């Protein structure tokens, strides 16, 4: 489902690092999370088919910088009975299945939430830095795509700036 969006955004990546002072805090309209983007992200709403024939609403916030694509995907599974651990593992497996190489994979913890951290490189030489969490019936995927030849600093800054809002 989200793999096609990620693959489409891999095309045409390559230029220098982003200016440190251009990053600003973005708060999603629902107030669920914050993340830093080096500009204003575009919002995209779509429906993805679920295994039972219904659809899962997905909201994405993304920014193509010319050197990379930075995005947060929010898939709303709140109408379904979903095993949070399995949802995170399935998303991680889907990301690894698109990769030619897995550079890093680990359990991660953020704001009291458990998740997965991945860095994979696809057959075209694009690196995907990914953080995956399942919180409150939503699957969150924080993704930075950039050519593997570029330094990892901007990708790390983006995924590490993501936080769940305190409620």
Model region roles, listed by residue range:
Residues 58-86, 140-142:
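A short acidic-to-branched-hydrophobic micro-motif
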Residues 3-13:
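Sec-dependent N-terminal signal peptides
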Residues 30-32, 65-68, 123-125, 137:
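Glycine-centered tight beta-turn/hairpin loop motif at sheet-sheet or coil-to-beta transitions
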Residues 21-37:
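Short N-terminal segments immediately surrounding and downstream of signal-peptide cleavage
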Residues 36-60, 90-135:
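Signature of long, low-cysteine stretches enriched in small and polar/charged residues
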Residues 29, 41-43, 87-99, 138, ...:
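Surface-exposed amphipathic alpha-helical segments
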Residues 30, 39-41, 76-77, 122, ...:
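A mature extracytoplasmic/lumenal domain signature
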Residues 15-19:
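Sec/Tat signal peptide C-region and signal peptidase I cleavage site
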């Amino acid at each position: 489902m989200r793999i096609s969006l990620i693959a489409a955004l891999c095309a045409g990546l390559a230029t220098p690092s982003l200016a440190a002072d251009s990053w600003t805090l973005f708060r999603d309209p629902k107030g669920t999370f914050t993340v830093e983007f080096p500009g204003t992200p575009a919002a995209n709403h779509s429906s993805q088919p679920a295994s039972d024939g219904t659809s899962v609403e997905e909201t994405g916030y993304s920014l193509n910088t010319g050197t990379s694509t930075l995005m947060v995907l929010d898939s709303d599974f709140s109408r379904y009975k979903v095993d949070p651990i399995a949802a995170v593992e399935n998303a991680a497996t889907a990301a690894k299945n698109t990769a030619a190489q897995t550079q890093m994979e680990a359990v991660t913890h953020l704001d009291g939430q458990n998740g997965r951290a991945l860095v994979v490189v696809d057959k075209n030489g694009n690196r995907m830095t990914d953080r995956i969490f399942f919180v409150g019936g939503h699957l969150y995927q924080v993704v930075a795509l950039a050519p593997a030849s570029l330094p990892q600093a901007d990708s790390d800054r983006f995924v590490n700036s993501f936080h769940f809002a305190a409620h």
